[in-house]
Amino acid sequence: MTTNTYDVGDVVMAAKALRNDGTYPDPAISIGEILVEAGTRGQVINVGLYLQEHIVYAIAFENGRIVGALERELEAAEDAEDATQAEPAATPTAAAAAEGSAPAAVLVAEKVPAEPAAHGAGGHAAKTCKHGSANCKSAAADAEPAVPSTPAEPAKAATPAKPATPAKPAPPAKPAGKTVGAGTPGAKDGRR
């Protein structure tokens, strides 16, 4: 089993520029665009697995983006003194959350830019969804005005079907001969 090098709360740096591989949720950022420059500091907020063998870290970087990164794309901060200065602005809140005054979910919400509340909330006028697709069915449904539905005409009464003709009954089985038991030929000693 693989073990993770970094734990939640550790301060790390991007070892190389991290680019959008198509999984970053902001449609304004195109595939291949740099999300995080090399050397940018961030804090590990989640540790998970990809394909059950690759450890992936969710990192809240200083530029406000939360990006998933593999272990080989990260490196430890140079020294602990710089790491304490480079922690995100929500660190005092993290200490308060540890004491029970604020839930941990609030910490993440303070660092993450707000997402649109509804599907397609960012582009009703252009009829595109938040993913940037112009032909998204849900975006078209969001953009269409609500029209009161008119009741459909009642369906015509169906004509009665012809009664099914019953199949001819099978003739009764004819005994092949007297038998004593199932499949046993008749007795040969004169009994009937």
Swiss-Prot record:
Q: Does the keyword field hold Nuclease?
A: no
**Which top-rank group of organisms is this from?**
Bacteria
Annotated region (Disordered) at 77-102, 117-192
Query: Which keywords does UniProt give here?
Result: Nitrogen fixation
Q: Which GO terms describe its biological process?
A: nitrogen fixation
**What residue intervals traverse the membrane?**
none
- Keyword Protein transport listed? The answer is no
Q: Which InterPro entries match?
A: Nitrogenase_MoFe_mat_NifZ
Q: Which portions of the chain have biased composition (kind: Low complexity)?
A: 85-102, 150-165
Q: Pfam families attached here?
A: NifZ
Its family remark reads:
Belongs to the NifZ family.
Q: What is this protein called?
A: Protein NifZ
